[in-house]
């Protein structure tokens, strides 16, 4: 039985090395500080958090050791990167980018199980302890959020890794880059040796099978994570994973499998895909925006707002007759989907598109409809920022009508 086998292993491990309660307490304080910083990029969606928490709770294998007092929990953060890591205090961090990259619950469960395996096997605390032997505690924790590799590590301990991680800022969005940088996660014990990755994956396969998930989700998930980084032409300096080479080694050990996909998962995470598309658009990453929205469209899960975001991205990337006509068709599709609940954003985007296409007369007609809808919205007694926005849009629309009349 996996439970008894693991329990015996951990008994021998902790009997030999001890629980290091004081070190764990200090690590917990550092983790809480790090999590406090991650709150800046927290993803707020109770439904998605509950969904991921449900998978995590089902896989939870830490009750096998009553001496482990950590409180296990899930945090979901905003990030384009397919990140997942478990802090040594029991906090599991999952990125919206990972939820968008995967296509099935089996894959998500696999990633969670692999990270949970590191925690159960105490890899993070062991790594921190090994590193701390060579550095005074004050210096060791002084620059957790720095972007230079200043921590002294026990070189012999890492001999089974081909390369040390090269440290650099990743091409990410705003504060996310520094919060999820390689030094920040490595200093919290998450720079795993190859042997640790393999042993955690092995435990994960057993745990997944025991809990009714497909163990092939490991290889499928890792393959899609590789696909993400290949698409973005990055093969090293990858937070948490180090390099594509490291991921490929894990796939070789886990065993090749076919790509998994499940519609219930795709349906559950479609709003996350829309969110990440909007985040990428706000940061002017238009190709990534379009790629994500097309995932929802291909899965027949797109909303009217998805089509609007895609039109905005397409218009930012290109200005040809073919693209403009395609964008116009997508806006018509969005309007059809909106039905009897007018989406003001559709009207605004259609006006901009028609002006680009030199169809001023049609744009003028849409402008008049837009003003009518805005006035009706204003008449509902809105206040504050909504009223300011409405007045601003009415003013803009009237200016555009005046401009068209002078063309």
Q: What are these language model-derived features?
A:
Residues 161-177:
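Hydrophobic alpha-helical transmembrane segments
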Residues 3-158, 186-191, 203-248, 256-262, ...:
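Peri-catalytic and regulatory segments of divalent metal-dependent proteins
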Residues 180:
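His/Cys-centered metal/cofactor-coordination and adjacent catalytic loops
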Residues 251:
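Divalent-metal (often Zn2+) His-rich catalytic cores of metallo-beta-lactamase-fold enzymes
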């Amino acid at each position: 039985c996996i439970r008894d086998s693991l329990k015996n292993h951990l008994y021998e491990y902790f009997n030999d090395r001890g629980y290091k309660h004081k070190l764990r307490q200090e690590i917990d304080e550092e983790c809480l500080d790090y999590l406090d910083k991650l709150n800046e990029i927290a993803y707020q969606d109770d439904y998605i958090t509950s969904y991921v928490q449900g998978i995590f709770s089902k896989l939870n294998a830490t009750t096998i050791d009553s001496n482990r007092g950590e409180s296990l929990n899930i945090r979901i953060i905003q990030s384009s990167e397919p990140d997942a890591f478990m802090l040594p205090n029991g906090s599991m961090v999952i990125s919206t980018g990972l939820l968008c990259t995967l296509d099935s619950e089996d894959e998500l469960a696999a990633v969670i199980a692999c990270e949970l395996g590191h925690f159960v096997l105490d890899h993070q605390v062991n790594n921190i302890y090994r590193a701390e032997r060579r550095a005074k505690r004050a210096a060791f924790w002084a620059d957790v959020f720095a972007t230079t590799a200043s921590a002294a590590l026990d070189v012999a301990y890492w001999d089974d890794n081909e390369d040390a991680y090269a440290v650099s800022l990743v091409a990410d969005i705003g504060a996310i880059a520094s919060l999820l940088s390689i030094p920040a996660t490595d200093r919290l014990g998450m720079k795993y040796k190859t042997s640790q990755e393999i042993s955690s994956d092995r435990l994960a396969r057993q745990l997944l099978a025991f809990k009714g998930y497909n163990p092939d989700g490991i290889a499928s998930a890792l393959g899609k994570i590789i696909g993400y980084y290949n698409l973005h032409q990055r093969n090293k300096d990858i937070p948490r994973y180090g390099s594509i080479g490291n991921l490929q080694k894990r796939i070789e050990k886990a065993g090749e499998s076919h790509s998994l996909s499940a519609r219930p998962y795709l349906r559950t995470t479609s709003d996350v895909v829309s969110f990440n598309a909007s985040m990428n658009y706000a940061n002017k990453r238009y190709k990534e925006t379009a790629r994500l929205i097309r995932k929802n469209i291909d899965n027949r899960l797109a909303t009217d707002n998805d089509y609007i975001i895609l039109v905005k991205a397409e218009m930012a990337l290109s200005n040809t007759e073919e693209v403009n006509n395609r964008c116009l068709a997508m806006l018509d599709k969005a309007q059809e989907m909106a039905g009897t609940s007018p989406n003001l954003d559709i009207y605004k985007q259609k006006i901009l598109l028609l002006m680009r296409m030199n169809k001023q007369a049609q744009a003028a007609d849409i402008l008049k409809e837009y003003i009518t809808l805005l006035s009706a919205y204003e008449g509902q007694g809105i206040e504050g920022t909504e009223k300011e926005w409405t007045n601003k849009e009415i003013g803009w629309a009237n200016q555009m009508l005046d401009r068209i009349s002078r063309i």
